């Protein structure tokens, strides 16, 4: 007897998801890796530092051991560098992981989450996987994210707002004062996920 995949058992939100399309590889473009600089993938074209490769080589020697699942030493370093308490730091396997963590932690069926059009493709995928509804916000003619408009799309079912600054792939960014003004407008119980994965590209002092 031939068995079919029980699609009706799959989470309704997951059934709405279309596969994420990552950036094309150098092989698919028929371009050597040395000639390709993938800004959208946030890749470092000059390679890892010698200090990083040296540290990795030492870690390999302990690959048979489970690492500290809490990442205590790394959190201590980040805490000292950024001046934030340890219990305010969460580690993840890249920003995708943290986005999905946040969606699962704060969203469920019947909620909605907001994000801007032309934003990072992972936002709607992470939202849908929880069963929550999408609320896509429009951008201006020059693809700028107008943060003053966010409050107009918020209702009682809104739980999370995802904002990338600078945004990938449009490259638009919001200033510190724009973000601060938006936070003052929004309800105190609304979670704002500020994605600054590409902040190294910004040179504007107002950022």
Model-derived regions, located:
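N-terminal "arm"/small-domain region of PLP-dependent enzymes with the aminotransferase-like
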Residues: 2-65
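Conserved beta-strand segments of alpha/beta enzyme cores
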Residues: 35, 88, 133-135
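Short glycine-rich anion-binding loops that position phosphate/pyrophosphate groups of nucleotides
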Residues: 42-45, 95-96, 120, 165-170, ...
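Glycine/Thr-rich phosphate-binding loops of Rossmann-like dinucleotide-binding domains
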Residues: 47-49, 99-100, 123-124, 170-171, ...
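Phosphate-binding glycine-rich loop
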Residues: 64, 72-112
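PLP-dependent aminotransferase-like
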Residues: 105-163
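Active-site phosphate-binding strand-loop segment of PLP-dependent enzymes
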Residues: 141-205
């Amino acid at each position: 007897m031939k068995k079919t995949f029980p699609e009706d058992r799959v989470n309704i939100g997951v059934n709405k998801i279309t596969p994420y399309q990552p950036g094309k590889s150098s092989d698919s473009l028929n371009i050597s890796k040395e000639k390709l600089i993938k800004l959208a993938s946030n890749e470092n074209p000059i390679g890892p530092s010698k200090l990083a490769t040296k540290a990795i080589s030492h870690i390999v020697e302990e690959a048979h051991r489970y690492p500290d699942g809490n990442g205590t030493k790394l959190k201590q370093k980040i805490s000292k560098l950024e001046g934030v308490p340890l219990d305010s730091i969460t580690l993840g396997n890249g920003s995708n992981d943290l986005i999905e963590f946040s969606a699962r932690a704060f969203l469920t069926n019947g909620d909605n989450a907001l994000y801007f059009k032309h934003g990072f493709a992972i936002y709607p995928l992470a939202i849908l996987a929880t069963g929550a509804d999408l609320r896509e916000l429009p951008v201006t003619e020059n693809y700028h994210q107008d943060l003053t408009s966010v409050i107009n799309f918020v209702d009682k079912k809104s739980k999370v707002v995802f904002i990338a600054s600078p945004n990938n792939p449009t490259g638009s960014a919001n200033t510190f004062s724009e973000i601060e003004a938006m936070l003052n407008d929004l309800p105190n119980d609304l979670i704002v996920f500020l994605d600054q994965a590409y902040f190294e590209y910004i040179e504007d002092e107002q950022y």
